[in-house]
């Protein structure tokens, strides 16, 4: 698998905008290459455990898969930090890729507000709803309370002998209050090692389990993220290095101080939200800040625009419109034509407004592409932060 088969990074509009000189870019690229070596050393020392996630064996779901087979909804109980990546992946899968309605719907219960719980219960049928509980320590009181709520509610709706078929617990510690609930109700469970950087939990095999139960192809996701990671450390992947070089050079030239993630259409919103959270988590040394497309921009903002370019789009039925000659040509034009035209219009509008623009053109959204996009952003963020850390040490 080549990165270019999944997505392409287009920096041409950044080059035309004069964000930085060739000399400044070359200096930034040299720093990025040095930062890559630093990251490799840290990874070899085990300091970046989430980078190993795509290469770990997938969690075996066979012992609960039969129970969850007929579920129409899967309720995920966990902390906001643990399930941020799952929210992003399920959001894009359910709103865009899983459109046939054949898979269970994933919902997330990470808010103690009673209104949130009862709103979910208003659409959840306990007979066809499974609950997956994610808790590393087994002692998180919000998670314990949510599970206790669910057990109380399900207990009144389902026969006691069938109750355990609707629950599965994922935890690291066997001597916890959560395990007392597991023993009391005889709930199925499995143990997983503690996960560092919970906001990168999408690279953790156990934390991908709820998506796997819903039909998400975890193997393809790991293939996309893992292959990209290998290409990066082997020096075959240039996209993160090029972007990091541009960012560092632009900031040094005082032309850049912020980065906005923006997806064309609402389908990319879950991805951009997750990317902002990851950047906030990993960005320890860089003054560079990330924000959403809802915040006002200034002239020193770089925008990353995501665009799916080769997806098959439906056409209108020309014969249906044959009695309206003025619309005949419009009806015969593939939707993809208008999507591309809108993309070009957005790009030109950004450039004319004096904003810096990078485009990431996705070939087609699927599990493999998502894995590559997620890993690319993580590596890019690590590079930028490491470059600023090195620069800080140079000054001192």
Regions found by a protein language model. Give the residues of each.
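A glycine-rich phosphate-binding loop feature that marks nucleotide/adenosyl-phosphate handling sites
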Residues: 225-230, 292-296, 361-366, 396
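Flexible loop/turn segments at secondary-structure boundaries
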Residues: 82-85, 114-117, 139-142, 175-179, ...
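Cofactor-/ligand-binding subdomain signature composed of acidic, glycine-rich
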Residues: 1-72, 380-392
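Glycine-rich phosphate-binding loops that contact phosphosugars or nucleotide phosphates
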Residues: 61-234
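C-terminal helical/tail subdomains of lipid-metabolizing enzymes
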Residues: 358-396
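Acidic catalytic cores of enzymes that act on phosphate-bearing nucleotides/polynucleotides
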Residues: 3-10, 40, 44-55, 59, ...
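Short, solvent-exposed amphipathic alpha-helical segments in soluble enzyme
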Residues: 91-94, 122-124, 148-149, 183-185, ...
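A generic structural motif
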Residues: 135-140, 196, 212-216, 266-267, ...
């Amino acid at each position: 698998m080549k990165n270019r088969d999944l997505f392409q990074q287009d920096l041409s509009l950044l080059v035309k905008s004069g964000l930085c000189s060739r000399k400044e870019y070359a200096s930034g690229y040299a720093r990025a290459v040095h930062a890559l070596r630093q990251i490799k050393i840290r990874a070899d020392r085990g300091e970046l455990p989430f980078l190993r996630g795509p290469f770990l064996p997938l969690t075996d779901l066979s012992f609960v898969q039969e129970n969850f087979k007929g579920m129409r909804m899967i309720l995920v109980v966990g902390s906001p930090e643990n399930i941020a990546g799952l929210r992003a992946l399920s959001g894009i899968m359910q709103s865009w890729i899983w459109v046939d309605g054949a898979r269970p719907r994933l919902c997330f219960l990470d808010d103690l507000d009673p209104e949130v719980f009862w709103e979910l219960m208003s659409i959840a049928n306990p007979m066809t709803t499974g609950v997956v509980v994610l808790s590393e320590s087994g002692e998180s009181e919000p998670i314990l309370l949510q599970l206790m709520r669910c057990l109380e509610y399900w207990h009144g709706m389902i026969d006691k002998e069938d109750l355990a078929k609707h629950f599965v617990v994922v935890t690291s510690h066997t001597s916890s209050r959560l395990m007392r609930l597991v023993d009391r109700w005889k709930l199925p469970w499995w143990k997983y090692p503690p996960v560092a950087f919970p906001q990168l939990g999408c690279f953790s095999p156990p934390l991908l389990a709820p998506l796997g139960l819903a039909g998400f192809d975890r193997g393809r996701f790991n293939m996309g993220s893992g292959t990209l990671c290998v290409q990066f450390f082997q020096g075959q992947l240039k996209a993160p290095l090029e972007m990091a070089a541009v960012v560092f050079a632009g900031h040094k030239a005082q032309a850049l101080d912020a980065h906005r993630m923006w997806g064309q259409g609402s389908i990319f919103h879950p991805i951009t939200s997750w990317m902002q959270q990851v950047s906030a988590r990993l960005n320890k040394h860089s003054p560079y800040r990330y924000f959403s497309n809802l915040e006002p921009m200034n002239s020193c903002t770089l925008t990353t625009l995501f665009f799916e370019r080769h997806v098959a789009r439906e056409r209108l039925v020309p014969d249906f419109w044959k009695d309206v000659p003025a619309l005949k040509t419009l009806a015969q034009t593939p939707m993809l034509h208008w999507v591309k035209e809108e993309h070009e219009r957005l790009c030109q509008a950004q450039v004319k407004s004096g904003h810096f623009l990078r485009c990431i053109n996705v070939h087609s959204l699927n599990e493999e592409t998502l894995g590559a996009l997620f890993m690319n952003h993580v590596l890019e963020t690590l590079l930028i932060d490491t470059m600023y850390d090195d620069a800080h040490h140079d000054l001192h």
